[in-house]
Amino acid sequence: MIKIAKEKRTFATKFKQMLMKETLKSYFGYDSFRPLQEEIIRHLLNKQDSLVLMPTGGGKSICYQLPALLSEGTAVVVSPLISLMKDQVETLQANGIAAGALNSSNDETENANLRRACIEGRLKLLYISPEKLIAEKDYLLRDMSISLFAIDEAHCISQWGHDFRPEYTQMGMLHQQFPQVPIIALTATADKITREDIIRQLHLIQPRTFISSFDRPNISLDVKRGFQAKEKNKAILEFIHRHREESGIIYCMSRNKTETVA
């Protein structure tokens, strides 16, 4: 009996792993996961809370988008900026994934249609601002089947973070109202104090913290000193000529300086 049980668990694990990779390929076009992604996804599919610290462009979104596709119900994603929501939703829809963003930039008819789609279970991911989530918690969320909560830019919840948003502090009510729904908090910037504050304020239950490497081998920092004002412009021009077919950004100390350099 013990051997049979182990074999069943092994088969279930392999089947889930196969399903995850098939979903990754068919919806997102990738053949393999980036470091930590697969582990985070398994953790979330097991209905466990987590805090994910990954650099920008490190693949945070797939950590909750893929579990949303493999779970019953709708994933609710809290995002602070309408522009970020729109970008995510457009990308998901282009990949054939039912997603929408409930926010103040929509007209009321569009928001009403989104609410209906959520209640009827036709959306896999709903993006929403913290302010809108608070307003909808006793109405829309109550009538939805929710697979998971993803709190993007989670450092906004902490006064120790660099981008504190008071509305984020009310996200702690999610576990109180929906104790069975797992929460994944994601950020690209949080020191130890901020991470502890995120976990405390969101009331995460025995969360696992995943910290990805922030090493960017394709990025280097080179400081050149000793230029006079006129020499700086000449040095910039020479640098641009050496990298004529490449992309780049020139940062200046003021708007006037930006116009002069341009």
Residue ranges, per PLM feature:
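Short, positively charged and aromatic/hydrophobic N-terminal segments
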Residues: 1-6, 10, 14-16
